[in-house]
Amino acid sequence: MSTEFEQAVAALHGEGVIAYATEAVFGLGCDPDSELAVQRLLAIKQRPVEKGLILIAADLVQLQDYIDLSQLSGEQLARVEASWPGPFTWIMPARATTPTWLTGQFDTLAVRVTAHPQVQALCRAFGKPLVSTSANLTGEEPARRVTDIGELLASKLAYILPGEVGGQANPSEIKDARTGAVIRPS
């Protein structure tokens, strides 16, 4: 593991918020199991907890502690799995044990299995998914390069992992896993 990855993982274990490249934009991430880390991320983003968050993972196995796959039919799960890894976020039933700092006011959770090699490696090195949201203040344009991360935002982060965004022009499409309805087009 590179020193950069070690620093990013250490920041995550220290309940910090990091920035890292995803398929389309730089993301802000933290430990989904740390309420303190999530509250820090929400404060940086100026985002209300009620809106809920997205988890990004290296594979479906990393998400199984947070989502209730038993509430999906075989066909629904097959549709989700056919889109991954990739820039597709699915709203899925949350487990009863999934904290409200992740789900917000919902009984569901937005999840994605990334195709971005650096994010896959980061999730594997950390051993679980990350909370993932775009690296910007709510309402502003998301960062597409490290240099786009403003000084104000950068000063609030525990670490910025150098990297390149993937080839996606827009943030991930969000769909409801049970209905197939598009919540946010790509």
Swiss-Prot record:
<keyword id="KW-0808">Transferase</keyword>
<keyword id="KW-0819">tRNA processing</keyword>
<dbReference type="GO" id="GO:0000049">
    <property type="term" value="F:tRNA binding"/>
</dbReference>
<dbReference type="InterPro" id="IPR006070">
    <property type="entry name" value="Sua5-like_dom"/>
</dbReference>
<keyword id="KW-0963">Cytoplasm</keyword>
<keyword id="KW-0548">Nucleotidyltransferase</keyword>
<dbReference type="Pfam" id="PF01300">
    <property type="entry name" value="Sua5_yciO_yrdC"/>
</dbReference>
<keyword id="KW-0547">Nucleotide-binding</keyword>
<dbReference type="InterPro" id="IPR017945">
    <property type="entry name" value="DHBP_synth_RibB-like_a/b_dom"/>
</dbReference>
<feature type="domain" description="YrdC-like">
    <location>
        <begin position="2"/>
        <end position="186"/>
    </location>
</feature>
<dbReference type="InterPro" id="IPR050156">
    <property type="entry name" value="TC-AMP_synthase_SUA5"/>
</dbReference>
<dbReference type="InterPro" id="IPR023535">
    <property type="entry name" value="TC-AMP_synthase"/>
</dbReference>
<dbReference type="GO" id="GO:0005524">
    <property type="term" value="F:ATP binding"/>
</dbReference>
<dbReference type="GO" id="GO:0003725">
    <property type="term" value="F:double-stranded RNA binding"/>
</dbReference>
<dbReference type="GO" id="GO:0061710">
    <property type="term" value="F:L-threonylcarbamoyladenylate synthase"/>
</dbReference>
<dbReference type="GO" id="GO:0006450">
    <property type="term" value="P:regulation of translational fidelity"/>
</dbReference>
<comment type="similarity">
    <text>Belongs to the SUA5 family. TsaC subfamily.</text>
</comment>
<dbReference type="GO" id="GO:0005737">
    <property type="term" value="C:cytoplasm"/>
</dbReference>
<comment type="function">
    <text>Required for the formation of a threonylcarbamoyl group on adenosine at position 37 (t(6)A37) in tRNAs that read codons beginning with adenine. Catalyzes the conversion of L-threonine, HCO(3)(-)/CO(2) and ATP to give threonylcarbamoyl-AMP (TC-AMP) as the acyladenylate intermediate, with the release of diphosphate.</text>
</comment>
<dbReference type="GO" id="GO:0002949">
    <property type="term" value="P:tRNA threonylcarbamoyladenosine modification"/>
</dbReference>
<protein>
    <recommendedName>
        <fullName>Threonylcarbamoyl-AMP synthase</fullName>
        <ecNumber>2.7.7.87</ecNumber>
    </recommendedName>
</protein>
<keyword id="KW-0067">ATP-binding</keyword>
